[in-house]
Structure formats: structure tokens, C-alpha cells
């Protein structure tokens, strides 16, 4: 897991590229990065979400020059009045340089890209039932009136029951078509893809 070891994964890859012969066992994060580099939009969103979850933006912004400004603007507009508490980054001592405003912005961006990721993953799951990943599609299992997630049909033995949602503020999720990207989300995805 070269890309699961904190900031600077690009430096490791640059060093490895100069070796004559290398034996690498790729990890799940490496596979996500390869999928993103190959143009898979769900992998791209997942890579960015993980970086935001751990406030590890160096590899994204500095290492690969991926422009996160469209995502930041979208997140600030969409979640302006949302504390995004469930999406605060998990930060270690090395991330102490982030001030409160930066942590809030990262939280907003994390929430925005998480919603986008789940929508993009749905298209893959729906197109490939042989993957047997339908239990990963969750937006259509939310009871918006009660604020619960219905997992009764997601396990082999009948399910895991109903669970209260910790966050119900998803303004870009259309309750009638929860996996559809809004035009603004589609724009963010395209800008990230082009970056």
C-alpha cells in the first residue's frame, strides 16, 4: 500500500521507477490510484475522499497537481450551513498546521465527494450485478421521513435492521432518483477528471 502511507506517495513511486527490477505487491489503495489514473471516476472520487478523510492533501495537490478548487467551491456553497461533523478529517500530530477554517473546509469537501462517490459507484454496481455489490448502494435504502437506513435485506440471513442516520443533510440527493448527479456535481467530476 504505497498510497496508504501518508503524504509523499509520489516520491516513493518516482524512486521505484528508477530501479532496474522491482517486485511490488499492490495494495487496495494502490489499486484505487491505478483505477483513478486509468480514468475510472468512482476510483477518482474514492481516492480524493480518502485523502480528505485523513487531511492528506499533499499527494493530491502538490504531488499530482490535482486542482481541488472546483470541489472546494461546490462544497462551500452546498454545505455552507452544515457543520459536517460526521465528515471531519481524522488528523494526527503531523496535521497540526490546519487551522479551524481549513478543517471545516476539508470536512465540507469530504462530505461533498463522499456523496459524489456513492452516486458514481452505483452506476458500476448497477452495470455489473455479477459483482454482487448491491448491498453497497445505500441512498435508496434511506427512509428520509424517519431518518433511518433500512438494511433488512442486505445480509444473507435477512438483514441487519433499521439504523438511525447520523446525518440527514444531503441536499444534492434527489429522494426519487438518489443516485443521479446534479449538474453541479457532474461539473465537479468533469473538472477533477480534466485535472
Label for each model-derived stretch:
Residues 2-195:
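Feature recognizes metal-dependent phosphohydrolase scaffolds
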